[in-house]
Design a protein with these regions (language model features):
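Expand to "…catalyze enediolate/carbanion chemistry for C-C bond making/breaking, isomerization
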Residues: 88, 210, 218
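Active-site rim beta-loop-alpha module in soluble metabolic enzymes
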Residues: 139-190
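Short, well-ordered secondary-structure micro-motifs
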Residues: 107, 125, 169-174, 209
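Conserved small/polar residues in nucleotide/adenosyl-binding loops
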Residues: 216-222
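Short, hinge-like loop/turn segments at secondary-structure boundaries
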Residues: 111-114, 175, 215
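A C-terminal functional module that forms or caps the active site or interfaces directly
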Residues: 185-214
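Glycine-rich beta-alpha junction loops
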Residues: 101, 162-168, 203, 211
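Metabolite-binding pocket within alpha/beta catalytic cores that recognizes anionic/polar moieties
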Residues: 2-143
């Protein structure tokens, strides 16, 4: 596959405020800027590099390896912008770290969910690929997270997650004019074994595939969806 190029490759990026050399090749992507310093607290020599809009970035090292963390904000549009601009400055590996709502009885609050695919119930990724194009995680990254979960003795699940655009449309579908459609799709996802519901992963997977970077997603269900 030919690597895709952007007109802003190699320059300081407009939204994230970062230039080549500001971040490591490996970047952790939470949504909430408020979680960035908590994650960076596990780094050695962590320094704030930039904070523009929803994109807050720290860079440091972890066990001797350079690593960065950058928030993306909530939802697929801002996530896609962040992934695009990180790819523009040479980042090759991205792991989204976030929270979600559990959709299966066996997926409990506090378990780890490693996404190997995502339901594309959002609009951003269709600006990149037709809806028939699968949103799947990088196999090597999924395997690496599985090994890490095993090594830590964590309870984990690997499978498909649902990505949506509307937070309240999901949590209060009966109040929406399209309630029938929302409820029918929700039932289909549950019966199809979808593990949890969130708002960013399919954009990461589709844009990451297009930009030829390695990517995956680790989520912690914090509620029942």
């Amino acid at each position: 596959m030919t690597e895709k190029k952007s007109m802003l490759d190699g320059e300081k990026q407009y939204h994230i405020g970062l230039a080549p050399g500001d971040v490591a090749d490996f970047v952790i992507l939470p949504g909430d800027p408020g979680r960035v310093e908590f994650i960076a607290g596990h780094f050695d020599d962590a320094k704030e590099i930039a904070f523009n809009r929803e994109y807050k970035t720290f860079t440091g090292t972890y066990k001797g390896r350079p690593v960065s963390v950058m928030s993306t904000g909530m939802g697929c549009p801002s996530t896609a912008i962040g992934v695009e601009e990180l790819a523009n400055i040479g980042v090759k590996t991205m792991v989204r770290l976030g929270t979600s709502g559990a959709m299966q009885e066996h997926t409990r609050v506090g378990d780890l969910v490693i996404a190997n695919g995502a339901v594309r119930q959002e609009g951003t990724s269709t600006e990149y690929m037709p809806i028939e194009y699968p949103a799947v995680g990088s196999a090597d990254m999924v395997f690496a997270l599985e090994q890490a979960a095993k090594d830590k003795g964590s309870t984990y699940h690997i499978g498909v997650v649902q990505t949506k655009d509307s937070f309240y449309g999901q949590h209060d579908p009966d109040s929406m004019p399209v309630s029938y459609d929302l409820n029918q799709k929700w039932e289909a996802w549950v019966r199809g074994g979808v593990l949890c519901s969130e708002m960013e992963v399919s954009a990461l997977f589709v844009v990451g595939s297009y930009r030829t970077v390695s990517y995956t997603h680790l989520t912690l269900p914090t509620s029942l969806a």
